[in-house]
């Protein structure tokens, strides 16, 4: 298994025609390719807008099927079994059932400067998928409450707070303003991994012996997480009972919210009773986030080249910048000048946070790809990190027990060829 090296933002980008994806103009007139995805309408319709633009320029129809998220993976799996896969798709994970039917997108990724830290090669040295966009864990503050309390929050890297300093700050805000809670955090292992990374942990790592291990920093992070789930700093009900942290923050009674970039549009549209702001996340020992997003894949078949042409066109600087602006995407290509309008400050902060974060921040996505390419599957939908964290939040067990249970569950469910 090869891992692609991390390159700097200034790495060379090949000329547009170097990989030979684009045809000679109208050669594809009248053709149609099927593109399956989920959530485009809820993200501003960027893919549909680009499909319309592509038709105007080339005469090729990109027929988008926006499938409900809960049905998407099943639809793809059924299509693979019935030999009815679309020509391309934006997926959340790579399914071994159709993994061997993917075209190599390495040329597209290289030509347009997709961040190499996000790429993973299969056993043949190919890149069957790469992220179309990034989501990133991030922090929001109730600016009104912070200002009322006279407490500052960092807006530049030279003023970063640690987790200890951050919790002290939200306690001060809570005491000065009568806010209900200092912090809410999405009940998600994705968010919890980010906190672990910020404590210096690499999380739970699968070794060559097909067994998981972790590090001492994970213990420190989980001890800290347990300590702030005290119904004072954080409400236990979010992790234990499923209370909505988004709604709690939007109530105006919480000083800060540990969530992610996908909240920006919602807050812009739906928070009117107080001022909110994106803030730099705490860094206990290092700066880190946790990256996610949707993967672009092209399936082998009669329309594969036409689909590749569209993907290559989509990731040219002009077109990719346009879809990022329409859909509010954090780009997977560095160095673009994306205009986010009223949300510019928030997205600038997210991009700065990503650029400054340790490489471990992309480990979850990259590792998931490497595992499936290597024939290692986690099995089922189990999420032991979240399950055991719920017990921690509720005071049902200590951290050593939680870690032992997480590793036991991960080991039990992993399959290695």
Regions of interest found by a model, annotated:
Residues 57, 230-231, 269-331:
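Extracytoplasmic/periplasmic substrate-recognition and gating elements
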Residues 170-171, 208-238:
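Glycine-centered hinge/linker elements that transmit conformational signals in sensory
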Residues 126-132, 137, 164-211, 217-218, ...:
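Extracytoplasmic/periplasmic solute-binding protein
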Residues 106-118, 155-159, 181-182, 201-220, ...:
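Short, solvent-exposed loop/beta-turn-alpha elements that line the ligand-binding surface or hinge
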Residues 4-96, 110, 303-306, 318, ...:
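Conserved N-terminal structural module of periplasmic/extracytoplasmic solute-binding proteins
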Residues 91-138, 164-167, 195, 358-359:
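Hinge/lid segment of periplasmic solute-binding proteins
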Residues 87, 111-146, 181, 277-278, ...:
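A structural signal for short loop-to-beta-strand junctions that line the ligand-binding cleft
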Residues 351-406:
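C-terminal capping/gating helix-and-loop segments adjacent to ligand/active sites or protein-protein/ligand interfaces
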